[in-house]
Amino acid sequence: MPAYRSRTSTHGRNMSGARGLWRATGMTDADFGKPIIAIANSFTQFVPGHVHLKDLGQMVAREIEKAGGVAKEFDTIAIDDGIAMGHAGMLYSLPSRELIADSVEYMVNAHCADAMVCISNCDKITPGMLMASLRLNIPTIFISGGPMEAGKVTYQGETHAVDLIDAMIKGADQNVSDEEALAFEKESCPTCGSCSGMFTANSMNCLIEALGLGLPGNGTVVATHADRKELFLEAGRRIVDLARRAYEGDDASVLPRSIATFQAFENAMTLDIAMGGSTNTVLHLLAAAQEAGVAFGMSDIDRLSRRVPCLCKVAPNVPDVHIEDVHRAGGIMGILGQLDRGGLINRECGTIHARTLAEGLDRWDISRSNDPKVVEFYKAAPGGVRTTEAFSQSKRWAEVDKDRTAGVIRSVDNAFSKDGGLAVLFGNLALDGCIVKTAGVDDKNLTFSGPAVICESQDEAVAKILGGQVKSGDVVIVRYEGPRGGPGMQEMLYPTSYLKSMGLGKECALITDGRFSGGTSGLSIGHVSPEAAEGGAIGLIQAGDIIDIHIPNRSIAIRVSDAELEKRRQAMQALGPKAWKPVDRDRQVSAALRAYAAMTTSAARGAVRDVSQLER
């Protein structure tokens, strides 16, 4: 039987000083020997997805203590990508993922915690904590703060469910009055929680369910609903059981690396493709796989994207459908259930709530479960009241959405499209691949060719789009915004939103070595690898070059010869210190960001640290 890690600091006369300090935190003799459970919270008043988390860590702590454990809470940082968007703040978003992973590792290892509950929610916090949990490989349960309710706006005589992206598009549309734009702004984010569409935060919280590290409903019960409280309480009870199984029962099956196997990563990516999740999830799954020691890469994503259909479309891919509607249709277990029927997932993977995913689906998939409590659970509805309080309402739908023919979640036979919601493209423009969210691409744009409009930064792209320098049929190239070139791999939500507001959302393509918000839709191709700053061909494109995009064939190319590209490469190399750097870009980059850039890898590797640099 492996000893509890915490005994390193709680047992033996030589640890009397440490025990003295533990006693000062409230521990007693009776606590020395119990499992110490770290609660990694992420409360902050900066972020609506985290503003309601302040007291929830202590609520979980009390449940841990009732179950026989000792709970110790700490907080991580949390950046709001929406507030950081469109200015230099976005440079810090992706790098914060590594800081979060490191800080969780530091706290847990420094204090010898035995197990962990991760209370996360928004874009980089869930991935950062996921990376840490796989590094540490101690029993871990994830519980998210939950999605925001969608807003409601009456516009041009019709009432619509709206979200942050609608407000951004209307705010930039000169045909929308100030009063109308303000109405969208005020109603787009009506409650606490992560933004209400299938954006990055909600995508990641849904994928946690597929990986097996979260409870059913983790990704879909709205933050305001009383049912989410039970998820938090159950996480507190269950983590003590997992800790005892791991240490007292020598059961390694409950450890994160035993659960998040190659097959589990396949399940998570399969879900992502089926629900048209954010392209950022690709970065985060690749990064998490590396922490788990799992050889899951772009070729695997490409393979899965060719066989998994699109079973669920949610904003921003379609209007008026949000995460609250996915929950009513059976949530993530409902989507996984349909994928299981199609033979598209690995049903023998373990989870923290059931021995296998198959057993979990038998209980939680509303298409096969006879448990009235499960059906009642998926009736949890938005309350429709502006609030920043968690668990503040208990409204329920009259019935769940079991329609698998034309409902929010479809069967494989009635899929929205045979091809899934994400695709990996390769070609001379992206030798190591790039990502497009096909669920958000209009059918007419699945093949697209047009002349390149070169932008050496996101700011230049915004200026050219709003300044009328981008025309129908153009391909906007935004480069030197990758992990190293940005640095920080900014999201391009403003350029894509402004294309929509200018009436060009379905008339242009945008290609970048940066990334996109989960709120992006349209022909938006990101994560181009290698990036320009690493010598990628995106840095060799010239204004007017024809770019050919063929999503069905998974190809993307600059329409110039190999000889011409080599000629341009040699000319670039001849620039010496100025080679592979943006032209005339005025950007202040802090020492912290320069340190990130010096260590990061390409998007094709998840933009994780190049640890080989540490082996010198």
Curated annotation (Swiss-Prot):
Chemical reaction(s) catalysed: (2R)-2,3-dihydroxy-3-methylbutanoate = 3-methyl-2-oxobutanoate + H2O; (2R,3R)-2,3-dihydroxy-3-methylpentanoate = (S)-3-methyl-2-oxopentanoate + H2O
UniProt remark on cofactor binding: Binds 1 [2Fe-2S] cluster per subunit. This cluster acts as a Lewis acid cofactor.
N6-carboxylysine sites (modified residues): K124
Cofactor: [2Fe-2S] cluster; Mg(2+)
Cysteine-cysteine disulfides: none
Assigned GO CC terms: cytosol
Ranges in a coiled coil: none
Binding site for Mg(2+): D81, D123, K124, E491
Active site: S517 (proton acceptor)
InterPro entries for this protein: Dihydro-acid_dehy_C, DihydroxyA_deHydtase, DiOHA_6PGluconate_deHydtase_CS, ILV_EDD_C, ILV_EDD_N, IlvD/EDD_N
Keywords attached to this entry: 2Fe-2S, Amino-acid biosynthesis, Branched-chain amino acid biosynthesis, Iron, Iron-sulfur, Lyase, Magnesium, Metal-binding
Gene Ontology molecular functions: 2 iron, 2 sulfur cluster binding; dihydroxy-acid dehydratase activity; magnesium ion binding
NCBIfam families: ilvD, PRK12448.1
Function summary: Functions in the biosynthesis of branched-chain amino acids. Catalyzes the dehydration of (2R,3R)-2,3-dihydroxy-3-methylpentanoate (2,3-dihydroxy-3-methylvalerate) into 2-oxo-3-methylpentanoate (2-oxo-3-methylvalerate) and of (2R)-2,3-dihydroxy-3-methylbutanoate (2,3-dihydroxyisovalerate) into 2-oxo-3-methylbutanoate (2-oxoisovalerate), the penultimate precursor to L-isoleucine and L-valine, respectively.
Designated name of the protein: Dihydroxy-acid dehydratase
